[in-house]
Curated annotation (Swiss-Prot):
Propeptide: 77-107
Keyword match Signal: yes
GO annotations of cellular component type: plasma membrane; side of membrane
Organism: Candida albicans (strain SC5314 / ATCC MYA-2876)
Null mutant phenotype: Leads to strong defects in host cell damage in a model of human oral epithelial cells, increased survival of infected mice, and aberrant filamentous morphology.
Region entry Disordered, spans: 26-56
Principal location listed in the UniProt entry: membrane
Keyword annotations from UniProtKB, A to Z: Cell membrane, Glycoprotein, GPI-anchor, Lipoprotein, Membrane, Signal, Virulence
Membrane topology: Lipid-anchor; GPI-anchor
Protein's gene: PGA16
Sugar-modified residues: N53, N56
Localization of this protein: Cell membrane
Protein name: Virulence factor PGA16
Residues with lipidation of kind GPI-anchor amidated glycine: G76
Length: 107
């Protein structure tokens, strides 16, 4: 039963933390520029042909990459928002850990 209480506190703490404005989250898109140029040369397939039409087909693909950064600031959920939120008693990741360990000690 103790394990379930701890897991419950962890889940609830993370939910409160996520909605209270603490921390920073960001994600970066994969850079696809290394596949922007695909070249296909059909030079070796014309050995038995007597024509001089050697086709050089070049396909160029331009990929636009973007970087998005999302930052959560301010706000909070009821009383816990003031504790875990920005400029609260427990601010940032260290504040989240302090709140989690404190809740565990209370169980």
């Amino acid at each position: 039963m103790r394990v379930f209480q701890i897991v419950y506190i962890l889940i609830i703490s993370n939910l409160i933390y996520a909605t209270s404005g603490g921390g920073t989250s960001s994600h970066h898109h994969k850079n696809d520029n290394n596949i922007a140029d695909n070249t296909n040369n059909n030079n070796n397939n014309n050995n038995n042909n007597n024509n001089n039409n050697i086709t050089n087909a070049t396909t160029t693909r331009t990929v636009t990459t973007s970087t998005k950064t999302k930052t959560h600031t301010g706000g909070g959920v009821a009383a816990m928002g003031g504790i875990l939120g920005q400029n609260g008693w427990f601010y940032g990741d260290a504040g989240l850990m302090a709140a989690i360990f404190g809740a565990m000690l209370l169980l």
